Amino acid sequence: PIATRKASQICLDHFCADLPELIGGSADLTGSNNTFSKHNTELTPDNPSGSHIYYGVREFGMVTIMNGMSLHGGIRPYGGTFLVFMDYARNAVRLSAMMSLPNIYVFTHDSIGLGEDGPTHQPIEHLVTLRATPNLYNWRPADLKETAVAWKESILSKSPSCLILSRQGLPQVKMSEDKISNISKGGYLVQKDEDAELNIISSGSELQLAIQAAKDLDQSGIKVNVVSMPCLDRFLEADLEYQNKVIQKDLPSIVVEAAHPNSWYKILGRDDLVIGMTTFGESAPAKMLFEEFGFTAGNIVSKAKKLLNK
């Protein structure tokens, strides 16, 4: 298993080798955000050509400085902090979207999956806030492959992007080349069954639970389509033909995401279901929290059977 914050660092090691215009940094969380690549050197008074900035505990200052670098041109800044601390940088993030500055925000520790730091550090409403921001793309990858595509698309983007990354290790999703090619569309079918009775849609760390639930439901004779949605913003820009190909509209849907559910209702029907977070978290190991808040394959199976009246 690889945490997507670590997967992000692996990607940085590749991209920074060929793109010297990438200037990184973190708001005093470099070791946790994994924003320092093996090609970076520290920017200091003695090394003004360094490519990594230690911004200190000042998220707003970090993003305003990134905005300035983007406005100058010739530089592609990326900066990291915990997702929950995005609140401190919110105004500057909003301005970057308003000005179409292609900053890359590395927001790690993306859910209750961060564990014992507790509710002060566990983001709940933050993904909804970011997804509601015009001209801002939010990628929540499930594994190394999705993280690599998220980085590539963020680098190619003319708008700012957020990489929403896990603290905890995640399994790698097995997929064919054609599925990998669809990641950039924001949402795609990880598993399709011609006899499907249900869509299960997920992102990030919960995708593994959706895949396991689909296997368990198959044992009960219930066929399922599994959809990975690393970037809802990008998916909603796709034509309706593609959207309806990915999310079969004549089937009920369940979304599984350890965040506030409000982002999802624009693609769901009235009777569809979101397994999400509508309260603040708790301080406990990640596995215990996922069980407490219903993020288990068993709970998805139970909800699916109830939704299908089986």
Predicted regions and their residues:
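Thiamine diphosphate
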Residues: P1-K310
